[in-house]
Amino acid sequence: MLTKTRAVVLKEVKFREQSKICSLYTRDFGRISVILKGGRNLKSRLSGLFCTGSLLEVVLYNRSNRDLQLVSEARIIRSPMTAEPSMERFSAIYRLIEILKISTGNEEKNIRLFNALERTLEKLCAPCRNADAAVAWFMLKLISESGFEPSIEQCVTTGKSILPMLQEGSADDLCLTYDPGGVSLPVPAAQKGPPGQRLPVQVYLLMRTLNRLDIRSIDEIDIPADNSRLLCDILQNYCSLHNNYNPSSKNRRIISRILYE
């Protein structure tokens, strides 16, 4: 069946002399694998289109009983290469693709998640002041759509509203717990709280803001780069744990050195 859909390229692998196999996250079919016959031939109309992180409109022959779908046509909608080169943007897109690969299953359709991904790539494929914050915004949507959205407004251990406690100066640090999933006020040293990650107050406030924000407004707020980067790390660890996956911290450290040292 010949069908049209939108897709984000998650991975590309050379196949034989001139072809390519790609993993795509699509709007209408979830994650699928496709083959581009002759797609590496410079004369092919598919040549140069299927690059990791690109948002495409694709026409493919889709058969439910086939592991590899055949691409007929494609056009680029958004590409990381269209804006001025930026290691910060490339790092953010790499993180976005990494978390998508571990969090989405084959042929699991989720239009709301794809729409959030499309809006995020629209922001990242243009000049963007807050690339890490855009990825953190997407991770919050991904976590929500995956069914393990953390409680952000109320402490998961006491049930108390967190913001009034912070305004009273009752806490310097918080914790993002895994089970139950949510933000927790500090637990006295003599007590054992649920496992989780340290969540600095300023990073918590950023998470709370992004959870309520339209991504189109993300460049209108002043976000310290260290806070958005740390929030990305915390959310990626949270998401990875719920997907029973150990994130590649080595790759993240390498990229951080390139960007910030």
UniProtKB/Swiss-Prot annotation:
InterPro entries: ARFGAP/RecO, DNA_rep/recomb_RecO_N, NA-bd_OB-fold, RecO, RecO_C. GO terms for biological process: DNA recombination; double-strand break repair. The keyword ATP-binding does not apply. One of its GO terms (cellular component) is bacterial nucleoid. Involved in DNA repair and RecF pathway recombination. HAMAP family: RecO. This is DNA repair protein RecO. It comes from Chlorobium phaeobacteroides (strain BS1).
